[in-house]
A protein has these predicted regions:
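Membrane-embedded transport module
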Residues: 2-168
Length: 172
C-alpha cells in the first residue's frame, strides 16, 4: 500500500499495455491542446488585424455584430473543438518525449503563428480592397471580407490538423 501512495503511476491491472496507452493518450491530449491554442490564437490575431485595418480605413467598413458572432462561433469554436478532440496520431509513441520545461507554445511556433495570422489577414484584406474597388463600401464588400476571413480560418484548421504538412514549411 505504501508503494501506491508514493508512486507517480499506479497500474490497476497486470497489463503493461495500459501504461503505453496512457502515455499515448497523454501525448495526444497535449498535442491537441497545443494545436487548438495555436489555431485560436492565430485566427483571432488575423481577425484583430483585419478589424484594425478596416477601422482605420473608414467606419462603414467593419463587419456587423452578427458576422463577427458567426465567425467566432462557427470558424473559431467548432474547428477548435475538432482540433482539441482529435484522435492520437499513429506515430505518437515513436516521437521522443518533449523537454520538461518546454512551454505549451514554443517561440518558433509563435513566430510561425504570427506569419500564418498575417497571411490570413493579408488574403482577407486583399479581398476587402478588391471589393471596395469593385463595389465601394457596403454589403457586397463586407460579404467578400466576411467570406474570405471565414474560409481562410476554416482552411487553416486543416493546416493545423496535419503535422506532416506543418513540417514542410520553411524553417522547420
Amino acid at each position: 500500500n505504501l508503494a501506491r501512495d508514493v508512486a507517480n503511476v499506479v497500474i490497476r491491472d497486470d497489463d503493461l499495455a495500459t501504461l503505453s496507452d496512457a502515455v499515448a493518450q497523454g501525448r495526444a491530449v497535449y498535442r491537441n491542446i497545443r494545436r487548438a491554442l495555436e489555431f485560436l490564437i492565430t485566427t483571432n490575431m488575423s481577425e484583430i488585424a483585419v478589424g484594425i485595418v478596416e477601422a482605420a480605413h473608414g467606419p462603414g467598413e467593419l463587419e456587423t455584430p452578427m458576422e463577427l458572432l458567426w465567425i467566432n462561433l462557427v470558424s473559431d469554436v467548432l474547428p477548435g473543438l475538432g482540433l482539441a478532440l482529435a484522435d492520437p496520431d499513429a506515430d505518437v509513441l515513436d516521437r521522443p518525449p518533449r523537454p520538461a520545461g518546454e512551454p505549451i507554445i514554443p517561440p518558433d511556433h509563435g513566430r510561425r503563428m504570427a506569419l500564418d495570422s498575417g497571411t490570413i489577414a493579408a488574403a482577407t484584406l486583399a479581398s476587402h480592397f478588391v471589393g471596395l474597388a469593385r463595389y465601394g463600401p457596403g454589403p457586397e464588400t463586407r460579404t467578400m471580407t466576411f467570406l474570405s476571413l471565414s474560409l481562410g480560418q476554416l482552411l487553416y484548421t486543416l493546416f493545423c490538423q496535419r503535422s506532416d504538412i506543418r513540417d514542410l514549411r520553411p524553417g522547420r
